[in-house]
Amino acid sequence: MDNQVVLAEDKKYYPTAEEVYGPGVETLVNDEDEQPLEQPIIKPVRNIKFEVGVKDSSTYVSSQFLVGLMSNPSLVRNVALVGHLQHGKTVFMDMLVEQTHHMPTFDINSEKHVRYTDTRIDEQERRISIKAVPMSLVLEDSNSKSYLCNIMDTPGHVNFSDEMTAALRLADGAVLIVDAAEGVMVNTERAIRHAIQEQLPIVVVINKVDRLITELKLPPKDAYHKLRHTIEVINNHISAVSSTAGNVKVIDPAAGNVCFAGATAGWSFTLQSFARLYLKLHGIPFEADKFATRLWGDMYYHPEDRTIKKKPPASGAERTFVQFVLEPLYKIYSQVIGEHKKSVEATLAEFGVTLPNSAYKLNVRPLLRMALSQVFGSASGFTDMLVKHIPSAKDAAARKVDHTYTGPKDSIVYQAMVDCDPAGPLMVNVTKLYPKSDCSSFDAFGRVISGKIMTGQSVKVLGEGYSPEDEEDMTVKEVTKLWVYQARYRLPVSMAPPGSWVLIEGVDASIMKTATLCNVNYNEEDIYIFRSLQFNTLPVVKTATEPLNPSELPKMVEGLRKISKSYPLAITKVEESGEHTILGTGELYLDSIMKDLRELYSEVEVKVADPVVSFCETVVESSSMKCFAETPNKKNKITMIAEPLEKGLAEDIENGIVSIDWNRKALGDFFKTKYDWDLLAARSIWAFGPDKQGPNILLDDTLPTEVDKGLLGAVKDSIVQGFQWGAREGPLCDEPIRNVKFKIVDARIAPEPLHRGSGQIIPTARRVAYSAFLMATPRLMEPVYYVEIQTPIDCLTAIYTVLSRRRGHVTADVPQPGTPAYIVKAFLPVIESFGFETDLRYHTQGQAFSLSVFDHWAIVPGDPP
């Protein structure tokens, strides 16, 4: 046998796998790659550098103390810093961070701002905030009592007002920051309106008071009038809005809800904290609060009998605010800027402050910062204002839950949320998603309303489409980590009690915009969701995108999904033609989205089409004839007419002033009293379209003598669905219908249920709505921007020219009080606005600055072809 000839292919050179590994091991032989070529065998760790982190983040109080304060909701204040672009929200936040953190990054000699809450690199480069970023700071009031202040720094640019909406939903109060020199601007106005719509109290910080001294060089008396004028304008806006939306306190420095600040120099005070400063320095034996009330308004100091009266003394004197507050402030500024060491020393000595000799060698700004922060101390006046005028997380819970929860008020869950009960069922309202460092997934940021959320806990994630009847939009996820989000670093916690803001890992997969988290095993009653965010603007600018390399389409689609999560108001959709479109609020918003899409979320080269705008379809007359349509089986016939809605009604429906969920009597009374409808029409409203807050109405205008109401009622849902489908995409160019009232004037419905199925009725209802619409002189509507332009007076004619060339028109040009600038207010069609800002800067040599925000819809001139 040994001499047997063995063929080459049968020769055995190596032992078999079974001989090597033994009979207990299964061996598989693959002769082909399981893994695609473009996928690496060992994945590299992706870490995209898009955020500014911080290694050393030690605070003056221990993190255990901060976490301990979270458990006492009556010591927690949740606020959002809101206001106009470049009014100093982020720098004001810097001042608070500097007072609570040991920060090597805060260099007293540096003249640059850290902008601590501008965590993204592009925010630092553009020098504006793009995302709302929260911080939880332990601040002390004037009695050295500690409070946990959860503060959200929001963007001031009108394009990013969706971030402000998300922040206000989580907050219990709004801190309105206003530039002392510029006063109330477009976004200040919108922030006031938005805060009042969210039923939040407002306190004001008048920031950049130093601009009145150093830039505008106003005398103290004029500075007082400028500040007073700003406060009056704010109050006018508050009273104008709150007359329709509930009661909000007016702003009054004497009441303590105004704080004056110069955040760049690190100082802030309220009249109350300034009064305490005087009491401490001079040992005056009366209450600080009483003195503070006399430091504002037409009050004068009489030195002969040391009293403060409304009547000025015979010798003449300035008002108390000018004499006691502004003059010392002016004195410090003028002497430090004048670099006269002796007089600075003498003035600071009056405030009980002595600086080391080395301090006087500093540049002007660092010296100002050092002197003023020592004179005014920490921001205890600001904390006092928050404590006194903004309710604690516990006290605010009832108003917050009433405004945001969609469920019934007599439930156990509702009561637990109102009581801020840590032992109650878990309810968390998530309104923001923040990307992880590799941008592959997101962490959800929300507010715990009741119960406690813990790491390792399984929760139900209820999306915006969830209801107890339709549970499709619900998933179960495990909470893997929890943090207190501190802008540039995160504080890990194992549990978050009610009233606190928390960043949650592990639940983001099914969340698109907002969500409600609740216990998995809570079965005692139905859980309802928190209302989705109600934005104060619309995404009307759209652009189409496609990948440069068509094979990378799946990557781009995944990136678009992440964009939709990251930007609260961005809408991404696929058109019938197959192109992917993104809708945003303006050019800067879309620019920011495209940067994120290319660099963070899809990492592919993307081609972008020229921006266009969304249109709406409407009618301007009643239908010229009754329009009918028969169902395909010829057994049903529906007749309709269309006519325009009354002026202002569409806005009322969209703003939630009237709701289809009201009972028929309340709904009827509203339309009867406000819009003069007759009782029959007012009581026969079937639906708003294309959704519950849609600007179109469907009415049943049939008479019981002519139509069988029982049969019509049987197909009501199908007709409503057909109407809403039609209203979502109109007959002219598939854009939503707006401002149209559809009336059913006749209907012949088959008595047998078999012949009146939804498959027959829905398309027919849509067809008849279309024909009624087309018979009523249809028109297109385009979105129109409200534009606010800041400019010197000599550029006015150039601005008028640029606007008129783009179909815009000026509604007002008014001088900005106390400054050499003018404010031009104008309307500009959005489709004409692309490149407007560049054009404006070119024609005014860069002196004019404009901001545009969606205002209303207007009919496009001309008849659509």
What label would you give each PLM region?
Residues 90-91, 374-388, 392, 498-520:
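Structured, non-catalytic alpha/beta "coupling" segments that mediate domain-domain communication
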Residues 224, 235, 245-248, 266, ...:
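Accessory interaction regions appended to the cores of large information-processing enzymes
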Residues 180, 203-225, 258-269, 332, ...:
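G-domain G4 guanine-recognition motif of GTPases
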Residues 40-177, 191, 216, 233:
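P-loop NTPase switch module centered on the Walker A-proximal segment
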Residues 1-75, 128-129, 134, 271-277, ...:
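Intrinsically disordered, low-complexity N-terminal segments enriched in charged residues and glycine
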Residues 142-143, 168, 173-252:
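Conserved C-terminal guanine-recognition region of P-loop GTPase G domains, centered on the G4
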Residues 88, 158, 184, 212-213, ...:
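Catalytic P-loop NTPase motifs of RecA-like helicase/translocase cores
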Residues 237-441, 572:
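C-terminal-of-GTPase-core extension/linker across diverse P-loop GTPases
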